[in-house]
């Protein structure tokens, strides 16, 4: 019997399909995982015991870097965040919530502005102006679908797992279908309809894309930030965090403290006021353990 390492690409009814060196092997999990109350997840890096008789067993789950989403995906390297310009309308507040959540999960984000082609010129110009700030603080921003599709294969590095996120109706499913169809054409695989209904619950799977994977999942249409500690929130606003090293007080929370570098840079226009407003709003929600307004609708 041989052992090999691979990545779980799908899981259904107690079986786990594991990609090992570009081949997919079907496995069963050993009972030891159940005893440990440990459940293998799509995205897990695992050790498989290979049997010439076709009885392959998953025997070890390697340490996870993270676990996000419902259904959960393990070891997500980056998130492609789909934010619409219209239908639904562009929201800086929602954008900041997503960025905060994924910063907390230690996952990088690439921003894609969808529906730019059906957005009135002046409105689109104003949105692009706002997104310029996010590029300045280190986020990659795409406003053109064709440009995104051209660059994505080189952005997804070997064995990385990417997933999509964004508000409902932003166009995640459309983009995901397109990317999966392209990947299937490249590999010669047969694509089946994804059958995404408004309330459809599906199994997560990974499909090969470039030298990594993209998770075929409904993504994250609603997030909550209640588990973040209030005094750690600034760590997930990278622009505020960078400025805070010059604050007079080491644990400055940028509220009423004297000598606050963050508030100084906001007044000078070097930090976007909208970012600070998002910080204060999320901070208040966490403090009060209160549901955000957009989740009440």
Curated annotation (Swiss-Prot):
Binding positions for Zn(2+)?
247, 252, 254, 260
Residue span(s) of domain CP-type G: 65-223
Where would you find this protein in the cell? Cytoplasm
Keywords in alphabetical order, please. Answer: Cytoplasm, GTP-binding, Hydrolase, Metal-binding, Nucleotide-binding, Ribosome biogenesis, RNA-binding, rRNA-binding, Zinc
InterPro entries in the record, alphabetically? G_CP_dom (IPR030378), NA-bd_OB-fold (IPR012340), P-loop_NTPase (IPR027417), Ribosome_biogen_GTPase_RsgA (IPR004881), RsgA_GTPase_dom (IPR010914), RsgA_N (IPR031944)
List cofactor names only.
Zn(2+)
Q: Which GO terms describe its cellular component?
A: cytoplasm
* Gene Ontology terms describing biological process: ribosomal small subunit biogenesis
The keyword Nucleotide-binding appears for this protein: yes
- Similarity section: Belongs to the TRAFAC class YlqF/YawG GTPase family. RsgA subfamily.
Q: What does this protein do?
A: One of several proteins that assist in the late maturation steps of the functional core of the 30S ribosomal subunit. Helps release RbfA from mature subunits. May play a role in the assembly of ribosomal proteins into the subunit. Circularly permuted GTPase that catalyzes slow GTP hydrolysis, GTPase activity is stimulated by the 30S ribosomal subunit.
Q: Which PANTHER family match?
A: SMALL RIBOSOMAL SUBUNIT BIOGENESIS GTPASE RSGA, SMALL RIBOSOMAL SUBUNIT BIOGENESIS GTPASE RSGA 1, MITOCHONDRIAL-RELATED
The protein's name is Small ribosomal subunit biogenesis GTPase RsgA
The gene it comes from is: rsgA
């Amino acid at each position: 019997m041989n052992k090999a390492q691979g990545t779980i690409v799908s899981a259904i009814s107690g079986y786990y399909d594991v990609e090992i060196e570009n081949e997919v092997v079907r496995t069963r999990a050993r009972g030891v995982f159940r005893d440990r109350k440990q459940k293998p997840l799509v995205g897990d890096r695992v050790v498989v015991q290979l049997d010439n008789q076709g009885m392959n067993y998953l025997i070890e789950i390697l340490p996870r870097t993270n676990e996000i989403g419902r259904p959960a995906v393990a070891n997500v390297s980056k998130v492609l965040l789909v934010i619409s310009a219209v239908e639904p309308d562009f929201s800086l507040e929602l954008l900041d919530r997503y960025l905060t959540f994924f910063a907390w999960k230690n996952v990088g984000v690439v921003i894609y502005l969808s529906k730019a082609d059906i957005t009135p010129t002046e409105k689109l110009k104003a949105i692009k102006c706002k997104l310029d700030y996010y590029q300045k603080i280190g986020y990659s921003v795409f406003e053109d679908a064709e440009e995104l599709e051209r660059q994505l294969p080189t952005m997804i590095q070997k064995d990385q797992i990417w997933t999509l996120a964004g508000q409902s109706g932003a166009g995640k499913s459309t983009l995901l279908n397109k990317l999966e169809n392209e990947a299937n054409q490249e590999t010669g695989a047969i694509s089946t309809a994804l059958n995404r209904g408004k309330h459809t619950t599906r199994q997560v799977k990974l499909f090969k894309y470039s030298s990594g994977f993209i998770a075929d999942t409904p993504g994250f249409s609603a997030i909550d930030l209640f588990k973040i500690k209030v005094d750690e929130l600034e760590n997930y606003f990278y622009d505020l965090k960078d400025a805070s090293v010059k604050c007079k007080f080491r644990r400055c929370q940028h509220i009423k403290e004297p000598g606050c570098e963050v508030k100084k840079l906001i007044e000078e226009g070097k930090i976007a006021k909208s970012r600070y407003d998002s910080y204060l709003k999320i901070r208040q929600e966490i403090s009060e353990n209160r549901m955000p307004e957009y989740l009440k609708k």
